[in-house]
Design a protein with these regions (language model features):
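Catalytic-domain carbohydrate-binding cleft regions of carbohydrate-active enzymes
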Residues: 241, 289, 301-302, 306, ...
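Conserved SGNH/GDSL esterase-like catalytic core that processes O-acyl groups on lipids
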Residues: 2, 8-97, 133, 247, ...
């Protein structure tokens, strides 16, 4: 067996490459029945016109003389050099096919296996100047070559990509990384993928999403027949050469208890009490992680929380990000993405609910009460986590690479986030140690393990750890929604989020208004206002029931098309009326009133931006009329513009109006009244 490649195949950077390079480790795995040859040439390019063509190296000639029965080719990394790809990209496919032809001439029966390129990390000095894009283009060309030549295709990229510490110099895998590559080749050659494997989220009491195709998937040894039975439904399939298999059942109606059985060879997994209903993911930071026993309603509601139709999947961290130093064992686990505890689906009961997210529980309970079908809630929130930690690596690499660089000293990331992370990993020596707050980390440790488990939508409560830079958050939040919708292959997946509450932090007025505008800019999103439930001194207000239920209102109105108001009054526009009066119009206004029965409070107007004065406010039907003797020509209006606000405008359902800031125009607008 010939391993054809460059310095990665050769084992550059590995202290004992004769023992730990990927070909050497592969030899150990395969045993004496195989002879593995390492024909890696550091710096080699696939391109004949590259700066060091593999065709011209002694390693190429040695590989031809080896007359391999199997050849694994991993070339193309060095072709990302600006001397190569920009000039000779049109020759890549033909040059690769020529290399394959050469191996086939040496042995017409040779089994050719092409490898998708291993990752190049963002720390590479040329990453943002072209290397990242060219790396992707070469990946696509390798897939084309595999199709044309009829060669097998394996993946060196996916298993290394979430583990940047395996690439100490951003390019060459260390011994552990080389071992992962060897295992990929070993499994491809032998078909041994360790037998039947299913996603960890498949357990007893799981809930499958109703009214959409139900896909069951996993791993098995190559070629093995996999049989899947869901209730009375049955399908079988065969695991492909990469060990992957899946079956898809037609959409099913809600069902309270069925059985899922998956078997392959002598292995069988049986999952009992499987329900079919509605599945939602609840995520974010500490206010979503905030547990029921901490909530103001705990003593009343926990004893009554037993519900066989409400199923919970609680992903709790192994280590909270308290103000402590973690030991080396913890740091090693973090590097290997072992941050969350093992979990399993459970039916709601007082013992389970007491430690479950309060917001997620009330969200799920209201959906279950309203829809009268089983509801499954997955919660993976992590206290203190910033938005960027929840976004996939490729999205940040291609659309916000600056946030990845030197993240512990990166001004895009909130100082408190960086300081807490630095404290937790203080015992680490050298670079490369990861932390839950690091960009991408929680996507890789908390989203990827879900393995695209079908969810109806997302309920999100986060933002406190990004309120220092509103403009950056506006970019990051859009990337987050795009990232998750792409991951679940659902471009219109509902994404409902909580606006930050009231707290005595000066940037929060602007942040709340930014969140309001984000809802208007991103399709299929909705925002639950919580400013009326805040605590001036506590970032974790205890009144969570209304927040969870406000999120559920959005889902019921917007996703399930129930006839109810999704939210409180949302600013539509403001215009000048006679004299110095301003009329403010709202969407979702219903019957405007105040939460306390007192005069409307919280409006300000200004002639010059930045010089606002309190306005007398009067409700007239669907409008609020404003006036101030100190403002002769009003041009700007704002509402609830205090970090801790006592603004009191609500609609007919008692739902509060959002903080907003806007310009005063000369013409009225049409509001949406629901």
């Amino acid at each position: 067996m010939a391993c054809v490649g460059n310095s990665i195949t050769y084992g550059t950077g590995i202290a004992n490459r004769d023992k730990d390079s990927y070909p050497a480790q592969l030899q150990t795995m395969l045993g004496n029945k195989y002879l593995v040859g390492n024909f890696g040439k550091p710096g080699a390019t696939l391109l004949r016109h590259g700066h060091r063509p593999y065709f011209k190296q002694q390693e190429f000639r040695d590989a031809m003389a080896f007359h391999a029965d199997i050849a694994v080719i991993h070339l193309g990394i060095n072709d990302t050099d600006p001397r190569n790809w920009p000039n000779y990209r049109d020759e890549f496919v033909t040059d690769y096919l020529a290399l394959i032809d050469s191996l086939r001439q040496a042995n017409p029966k040779v089994r050719i296996i092409l490898a998708r390129l291993s990752p190049i990390a963002h720390r590479h000095p040329r990453f943002i100047s072209g290397t990242q894009q060219w790396h992707e283009q070469i990946q696509a060309s390798i897939e084309t070559v595999a199709e044309i030549s009829g060669s097998e295709l394996i993946d060196f990229h996916a298993p290394l990509y979430p583990y940047p510490f395996l690439l100490p110099d951003a390019l060459h895998p260390n011994a552990e990384g080389a071992g992962i590559m060897a295992k990929v080749v070993y499994s491809s050659i032998t078909g041994n993928y360790g037998g039947l494997h299913l996603p960890a989220v498949y357990t007893d009491n799981m809930v499958l999403q109703r009214d959409v195709p139900i896909t069951i998937h996993g791993k098995a040894n190559a070629g093995e027949i996999v049989k899947v039975k869901l209730g009375s439904l049955y399908q079988s399939t065969r695991a492909n050469q990469q060990g992957n298999w899946q079956v898809t059942f037609a959409p099913q109606k809600a069902e309270r208890s069925t059985t899922l059985t998956v078997s392959a060879g002598k292995q069988k997994r049986i999952f009992q009490d499987v329900a079919i209903g509605e599945v939602w993911l609840c995520s974010g930071q500490s206010n979503m992680a905030f547990m029921m026993h901490q909530a103001a309603t705990a003593q009343r509601d926990i004893p009554l929380s037993g519900d066989e139709d409400l199923h919970l999947y609680d992903m709790k961290p192994n280590w909270e990000t308290y103000d402590v130093e973690w030991n080396k064992s913890v740091l090693d686990s973090l590097n290997h993405l072992q941050y969350y505890r093992h979990s399993a689906w459970t039916v709601a009961s007082p013992d389970v609910v007491r430690d479950f997210s309060a917001v997620a529980y009330y969200f799920g309970r209201m959906l279950r009460d309203s829809l009268q079908v089983p509801v499954g809630i997955i919660c993976n929130a992590v206290g203190g986590s910033p938005t960027e930690s929840w976004i996939d690596r490729h999205t940040l690499e291609s659309r916000f690479p600056a946030i990845l660089n030197n993240w512990l000293h990166n001004d895009f990331i909130q100082p408190w986030v960086r300081q807490r992370a630095a404290k937790n990993i203080a015992q680490a020596k050298g670079e490369g140690v990861r932390h839950p707050y690091e960009p991408c980390y929680l996507f890789e440790s908390g989203i990827l393990p879900l393995e695209r488990y079908t969810v109806k939508g997302v309920a999100w409560y986060q933002g406190e750890s990004n309120a220092h830079n509103i403009e950056a958050h506006e970019t990051l939040f859009k990337l987050l929604v795009d990232s998750w919708r792409q991951y679940w292959n659902n471009v219109s997946m509902p994404f409902y989020f909580v606006q930050l509450s009231s707290l005595d932090r000066p940037s929060w007025t602007w942040f709340r208004d930014s969140q309001r505008r984000l809802m208007q800019q991103i399709p299929n999103t909705g925002m639950a206002v919580s400013s009326d439930l805040g605590d001036s001194l506590n970032v974790h207000p205890t009144h969570k029931q209304k927040i969870g239920e406000r999120l559920a209102r959005w889902a019921l109105a917007d996703t399930y098309h129930r006839p109810l108001m999704p939210c409180g009054p949302l600013f539509k526009c403001a215009w000048r009326e006679a004299g110095n009066k301003v009329a403010v119009s709202f969407n979702d206004a219903g019957k405007l009133s105040t939460s306390d029965g007192k005069p409307v409070y919280g409006f300000e107007i200004a002639q010059y931006d930045g010089l606002f004065y309190p306005a007398h406010a009067e409700i007239k039907g669907q409008l609020v009329i404003l006036q101030s003797d100190k403002v002769r020509e009003p041009r700007f209006v704002r509402y609830g513009w205090q970090p801790y606000t006592r603004a009191n405008l609500v609609n007919g359902d008692g739902l509060p109006a959002s903080t907003f800031r806007g310009e005063v125009t000369t013409h009225p607008c049409v509001s949406r009244m629901e």
